[in-house]
Amino acid sequence: MLYESMETAKKMRYILNMSPVLNKDAMFSDGTEYYRTPVEPREGDTVTIRFRTQRNNVDNVCLVHDGEYLEMKREKTSGSFDYYTAQIVMGKDLVRYYFEIHSGLVTCYYDTNGVSTRHEERTEFEIYPGYHVPEWLKGAVMYQIYVDRFCNGDPSNDVETGEYFYIGDTSVKVDNWEKVPAVMGVREFYGGDLQGVMDKLDYLQELGVDVIYLNPVFVSPSNHKYDCQDYDHIDPHIGRIVEDCDGLLSPGDSDNSHALKYIRRVTDKRNLEASNKLFQELVEEIHRRGMKVILDGVFNHCGSFNKWMDRERIYENQEGYEKGAYVSADSPYRSFFCFQDQNRWPYNPTYDGWWTHDTLPKLNYEESEELCRTILDVGRKWVSPPYNVDGWRLDVAADLGHSNDFNHHFWKEFRRTVKEANPEAVILAEHYGNPESWLRGDEWDTVMNYDAFMEPVTWFLTGMEKHSDEYREDLYGNSEAFIGAMKHHMQSLHMGALYGAMNELSNHDHSRFLTRTNHRVGRLSYAGAEAASAGINPAIMREAVVIQMTWPGSPTVYYGDEAGVCGFTDPDNRRTYPWGKEDQEMLDFHKRMICIHKAYPILAKGSLEFLWNDHQGLSYGCFSDSEQIIVILNNQDQERDIRVTAWKTGVSRKEATAFQRLMLSSGEGYTEMPEEYIADAGILQVKMPAYGAMVLHHRARDKYK
């Protein structure tokens, strides 16, 4: 026959273009609750899996899992679609599946890549029995706070100029809240603290925040605090100082054993206990308001000031503290670190540093069971009473240890320890690249979503690399690249991980998104601070916020983004929050989009389908069986007409369907003024303004008459 004699390439073109005989665009399934229930099954659960086709368009559909073929039953017909179902029972092991569709002589396949003429194992759907991500995280609106730059609620705990010596100079107290951070600003302190966070909880609640993610808060000599000095205590400089003294360093003195004021502040048990108590009170108040809080866990490395190392000899003669590993070969912490020269004590400087940084000693887990137990105790302590934090964000989590095998072993133990103490605590990892091997239900819950959110969004809308280090014309407005990147990287995230993934536009490691809208390559060191806000386009920022608030996952606002803060990458991205000088339009827009995100749960847990795209243009839908939200983006600098295939979200192809506009943003501002748009035969015709973003909504009862 004709089909049987075709070459493979011709068969592929034949299959993909033979509509209406076989409508590939109508085929759909995913891992959401609308196409797989339960979404996160346990061993022994019966799982119902669904598949959608065009009505009366296929002969049969088979669910293929682990080599077994199950013919699916047509469960129902709704509108223009048929829905097929099959059930499988979960065992202990991973289940992989895909769909095989037959129509006449044609056979095609459906997996996480969509329709294909050839089955590939690497793109099959996967279910890990027992994989569970806390429900409260899924779709939660998160807010990241870099504490020193957010709000100064207690000036009495401010770091003083000359209080101690760190990386080439003494600490600096910045008196001007609006001053731009210095290029080498790691030892600059603006005075933000936990009392300031407490004072602004009304603001965060009004904004619509569900979860507060705090950058590190433990004792540390830097403002970023990724160089931990004491994992058991909140830094009194952002907590409470109840015992103080004189004793700043003399000019030219770099010996921190003379830094008496600093030593008193960070080693006196009364200060440490008072600071922990303040943190406890903060968490209690956050919980009282119905919000959650996540801490930053920096467990790959610590700081050279750390009491286990004590390179600065801060703890050497303090009552109640053991000798640090730098100080003495007999230190109980010697095995916590790897020393290259065993003959250099006392004061041995030959320890391994993370990326060779001597201020960041690499923790030597494989050689110290005691270190492993200690860090596991830290993980348990802060999610347990009386602190009761709601989870951990794990810094450079894949770097921990010296081998992949140990890394996975440790995170399994960490998860077991944390979840036993607080089953609803979340474990969220910083990770670049494919996280799949950590996301199998026994290590991390989810990740900071760089690959499947931040990077594709910034390339598409701005053409900029996320540090503002590169501009690429070939990726600016390239919707095909955006869709390809999203589909590819989302395959690595199972539904629970995707629902809880931290979807950020900016953070403490990358340039502010608003700065990226000026398409300018630059850093503070050579471009200057003013260049970060020159030529910015707030309308593109609003487009990004629309995506952020309508994409599966947990939209995470980096403090100040909502207020219009600009900045190149670290340290310029750590400017202070501009209290009283916010970009009010940008702030109000964030509030309104957060309201939309929270009012329509399908934005957090619905199915996602791309509906239309071209250069500088994109549309996608979030939908269930009875509800649809369509997002349309025009990133061009001129108005244009756009035709969107709304029927792919499940609306009728035969009857007119009314969509209500929830939001329209453009270069002129934004409006929530209601307006009705009619999808005729499943097609929406929309005139989109320049740099426009539109959000449309339809429920089954809104059918146009």
Residue ranges and their predicted role:
Residues M1-G139, Y143:
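Glycan-association/targeting regions that enable binding to alpha-glucans and other polysaccharides
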Residues V141-Y143, I212-L214, V293-L295, W392, ...:
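Hydrophobic faces of well-ordered beta-strands that scaffold small-molecule active sites
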Residues P38, D45-R50, L611-V651, Y691, ...:
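Carbohydrate-binding surface patches
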Residues R55, E676-K705:
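C-terminal beta-strand-rich structural cap/linker in extracellular carbohydrate-active enzymes
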Residues V147-D210, V217-P386, F414, E420, ...:
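Substrate-binding/active-site clefts of carbohydrate-active enzymes
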Residues F51, I145, L204, L214, ...:
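Conserved, mostly hydrophobic/aromatic
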Residues F305-D310, G379-R380, P386, W411, ...:
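Conserved alpha/beta catalytic core and glycan-binding cleft of carbohydrate-active enzymes
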Residues P578-L611:
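Aromatic- and carboxylate-lined catalytic core of secreted/periplasmic carbohydrate-active enzymes
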